[in-house]
Amino acid sequence: MRSICLVSIFASLLFASFALGQNQPRGPQPPPPAKAGPYKAVSVTPPQAISDATFEAFRKQMNEAAQRKDRGALAKLVVGQGFFWLRENGDRADKNKSGVDNLAAALGLNNKDGAGWDMLASFADDPTGSSLPERKGTVCAPADPTFDGKAFNELMQATQTDVGDWAYPVSRDVEVRALPQPNAPVTEKLGMVLLRAMPEDGSNIPTFLRIVTPAGKIGYVLVDSVAPIGNDQICYVKDASGWKIGGYIGGGDTQ
């Protein structure tokens, strides 16, 4: 299970993903999300860590390269050829470029003012991973939690929401508070169920996330006590030489 301290690194990505979904220009506008109200509780099991000492050592190297913004060191940790970058419209990797160049494009590492290196460090700190069925021998992180997909689809239809509106607690008994303050009254403690997130407007990343509980009550939880559903993922492969970054799944850099 991802610990709270590790998930906290993804706090900025959590809010970025919610904000991106709300601010992107769209074509035909979908119906507005249903107002806060009760919804069916869908059980969720957090992802498990990969039990492999070599993977832990690899992530440490990856984190060190990210902290130093050392592209040369990073290049040694990425496949030379065969890197994939899966987006909604297919594989966007440039097969004429090296793996590290494609990874840099996916994360926006060439943007000095961007968060690409911080995102890379965040990925490196996550010990979870799940297999990518269409690519044998590939695992991607952060791994998604386990839940009933059919029930989740029905839940999104009932609430007129999409994947980006949902999160899950990283541990049992996460405290929900009446206000976004550490000393605010605790209104309830959460079970291991999917949660509807309703972030408040604002450019700063807050300490608390506004949510709607299955009972339909609005409350606030510490942002590092939950994790998003459907996050971007970085993917790894392992061969005779060890672990390598082999691909990326998600929107990546907008440039």
Regions found by a protein language model. Give the residues of each.
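Short, well-ordered alpha-helical segments enriched in acidic and aromatic residues
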Residues: D70-Q81
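Positively charged n-region of N-terminal signal peptides that target proteins for export
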Residues: M1-V7
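Short, low-complexity N-terminal intrinsically disordered segments enriched in polar/charged residues
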Residues: Q24-E64, K76
